[in-house]
């Protein structure tokens, strides 16, 4: 296992592996159109990066793709009723559907979260980073929505269920951020220090964003 050097130690260089949008279910095709890359493809990308012996890795958001558009399950093929029916039935059978009237951590909703996270995070990463420290930071899709702004739907700022679903998923599957403003393990903000060679802040800029007037913000003090 690899650990970090003392924050005040002299370090000549640091190598960082960084990537984004690794989430999504197992890749599939419909009518020749590809939806997501196969897990094996993504794992080959990981292997290529790890072969360069990085000192640590940062996974920048979109650890999952499960956009609900305010509903209980993804509205796949919403413009085609037949596709929506068949894919919706398949998703409900394999993964289950959320009950938004309950907390995201309820027994029913937690089962759905685990079905999603086991495929898109646990099965993807496995133990590949066991010897390389890795940090997760969330983005819009980790709140179970794309950052859409349409006439009939504006997905952000995230609603209470989306925030709760993110928190539950992060607590189940994310490695914690340990160097935080209040010294408590966090999921949305943290500092990375690698000796005296590197110091950087990583923060969630999606989940707590607000819109309008001079008080609009991206990063909440509550993080």
Predicted regions and their residues:
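Metal-dependent phosphoester/phosphodiester hydrolase catalytic core
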Residues: 1-223
């Amino acid at each position: 296992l690899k650990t970090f050097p003392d924050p005040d130690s002299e370090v000549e260089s640091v190598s960082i592996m960084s990537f984004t949008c690794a989430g999504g279910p197992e890749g599939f095709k419909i009518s020749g159109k590809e939806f997501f890359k196969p897990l094996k493809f993504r794992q080959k990308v990981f292997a290529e990066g790890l072969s360069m012996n990085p000192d640590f890795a940062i996974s920048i958001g979109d650890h999952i793709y499960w956009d609900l558009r305010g509903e209980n399950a993804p509205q796949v093929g919403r413009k085609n009723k037949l596709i929506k029916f068949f894919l919706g039935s398949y998703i409900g059978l394999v993964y289950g559907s959320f009950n938004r009237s309950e907390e995201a951590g309820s027994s029913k909703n937690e089962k759905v979260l685990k079905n999603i996270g086991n495929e898109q995070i646990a099965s993807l990463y496995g133990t590949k980073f066991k010897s390389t420290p890795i940090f997760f930071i969330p983005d819009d899709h980790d709140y179970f929505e794309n950052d859409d702004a349409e006439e009939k739907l504006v997905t952000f700022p995230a609603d209470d269920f989306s925030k709760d679903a993110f928190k539950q998923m992060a607590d189940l599957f994310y490695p914690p951020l340990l160097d935080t403003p209040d010294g408590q393990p966090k999921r949305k903000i943290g500092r990375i220090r690698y000796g005296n060679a590197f110091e950087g802040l990583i923060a969630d800029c999606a989940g707590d964003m607000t819109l309008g007037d001079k008080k609009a913000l991206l990063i909440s003090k509550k993080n």
